[in-house]
Amino acid sequence: MLLAQQLNLYILKGEIIMKKIKIAIVFGGQSTEHEVSRNSVTSILKNINRDKYEICPIGITKEGKWFQYTGDINNIKNGQWEKDNKNKLENGYNVLFNKEVELVFPVLHGLYGEDGTIQGLCKLVGLPCVGPGVLSSALCMDKIYTKYVLENFKFKQANYVVVNKFEYEKNKEEIIKEVEKLQYDVFIKPANSGSSVGITKAHNKEELLKGLEEAFIHDKNVLVEEAINAREIEVAVLGNDDPKAAVPGEIIPAKEFYDYEAKYQNENSELLIPANIDNIKQEEIKELAIKIYKLLGCSGLARVDFLMDKESNEVYFNEVNTLPGFTKISMYPKLWEASGKSYSALIDELIELAINNK
């Protein structure tokens, strides 16, 4: 009987029947990546195996209201689900707090989704959650603290300066002088944002000042990094204690760098899968990705991004994304597809990893 429960089976009239696992798939949210989340979850809902799972979609509006949604999946992608009052039930919170589901699959990009917030909620109510836990999610979300940790372990990174809004407003000239010890061009990044939201590239002091003001809209702490003439390489990592890496991919941005528009609105950006690098370098990058994944305490999944110098081929750590984009054309699932794992099989494995991640 215990074995049957572990395998999610029950017996009906002498036949072994697989009991469906009830999963809450949470989407939307209050971050600037709300629309990205809707795209990702639409793809997941269309490809998840309904023979294995009973799905309970839970949408969070930009205002922070939770609803269970039972209507047309296509209404999620275009945002019309919020107006579909007939299929919008005001019990989104209760589904989790009353443990009406067995597992939570958060498809919430950015703040309140991959920063440890919903992971903490799941831990509090005792529900398994797809992806990394509270600490690793929070750590990887903050670009500055991720850099501090990996710097301690001697991983190569671009030269950088951290700017705090309060200190900047008190000592503007002094801080600009410190930042300008870096060589232009520089990237200016809010510490906690994904999908390149709020990121700008500065070629001079005037653009630096504008970029800092833009970044401070999104976060009080900002990372200013020296730009490297580099190729953008991304690695999909999957697993708990013994993670594996897919073939690396490369991004050829349509613009000067891979900002929000280039990612989601400009169809001229290219994804090269696998990246056009030799096998020895591919293995080196995959090993680096797995080391970083384990050092940061990740589980389930993450995408580890690197910069590879176009002249020296030196590899520099860029960032970790613990809940990467999940449309069928997103890099993370496409890298696994190129490595022999279908989109549906990837979803299955993520759910299994969450269940087994004690």
Swiss-Prot record:
Q: What does this protein do?
A: Cell wall formation.
Instruction: Cite the binding residues for ATP.
Output: 179-234
The alphabetized UniProt keywords are: ATP-binding, Cell shape, Cell wall biogenesis/degradation, Cytoplasm, Ligase, Magnesium, Manganese, Metal-binding, Nucleotide-binding, Peptidoglycan synthesis
Q: What's the cofactor?
A: Mg(2+); Mn(2+)
The name under which this protein is listed is: D-alanine--D-alanine ligase B
NCBIfam families tied to this protein = D_ala_D_alaTIGR, PRK01372.1, PRK01966.1-4
What's the gene?
ddlB
Pfam families per the UniProt record, alphabetical = Dala_Dala_lig_C, Dala_Dala_lig_N
Q: Which EC number(s) are documented for this chain?
A: 6.3.2.4
